[in-house]
Design a protein with these regions (language model features):
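Processing junctions and N-termini across compartments
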Residues: 49, 86-89
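N-terminal export/targeting leaders of redox proteins
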Residues: 1-47, 67, 78-83, 101-199
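N-terminal, post-signal-peptide region of Sec/Tat-exported proteins
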Residues: 55-85
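The canonical Cys-X-X-Cys-His
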Residues: 53-62, 89-99, 186
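Short N-terminal amphipathic alpha-helix/helix-capping patch enriched in small hydrophobics
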Residues: 42, 51-54
Length: 199
């Protein structure tokens, strides 16, 4: 078979598969995020960020990352995969690089991936998220100190305050608490014993 013809056929097949994924609506039974009014305590400031779409989009309760200001299921049929970095042909790093791409609107930060399924926060209350976050069985075996480090220094977490622009050139929404205030709140909450208030 002619190599050029084979190349054209494979390209057409790939484009067709991408079109099918892009135009297939994925239905999910995942519950919506439970929101409530923010108060002025360190816990509430921290949770206002952790329950914001910039965090929840990558902490889904199913195998589909979310995207956009409306937190819709990721385009192109992207799925979690065994290592939380997508499946063979649709790895996170195929599109998401180490920084935002202002030409395409694709967001990026180092170590772009979904949180492990044990760290699913979608549909949980703030109290449930905090309990999960402090439970070594759910948080990857982290101590409180390691959890604070992750929440306040990890580049992917801090990306939330530099989320770039979307494909239409519109700025993405940042969390409702400024970064410095959030970091202080996380550290203050931990220093006070990481107490979780009653619901």
């Amino acid at each position: 078979m002619n190599v050029k013809l084979l190349y054209l056929l494979l390209t057409a097949l790939f484009v067709g598969i991408c079109w099918v994924f892009a135009n297939t609506e994925i239905k999910t039974d995942s519950p919506p995020l439970v929101q409530r009014e923010m108060e002025d305590t360190p816990f509430d400031k921290m949770m206002a960020v952790l329950t914001h779409k910039r965090c929840i989009n990558c902490h889904p309760s199913d195998n589909y990352p979310r995207q956009g200001e409306d937190s819709h299921v990721h385009n192109f049929g992207v799925r979690r995969g065994e290592d939380n970095h997508g499946v063979a042909a649709l790895r996170c790093e195929s599109c998401h690089q180490h920084e935002n791409n202002n030409f395409s609107g694709v967001p990026g930060a180092p170590e772009w991936s979904l949180a492990p399924k044990s760290m699913a926060w979608q549909g949980l209350t703030r109290v449930e998220i905090a309990k999960s976050m402090l439970n070594p069985e759910n948080n990857g075996g982290r101590t409180l100190e390691e959890t604070v480090h992750h929440l306040t220094e990890h580049e992917l977490v801090l990306w939330a305050w530099e989320p770039g622009i979307d494909a239409n050139g519109n700025p993405r929404e940042k969390p409702p608490v400024p970064k410095d205030e959030y970091i202080k709140a996380v550290k203050a909450w931990a220093a006070a014993g990481a107490k979780i208030p009653n619901e």
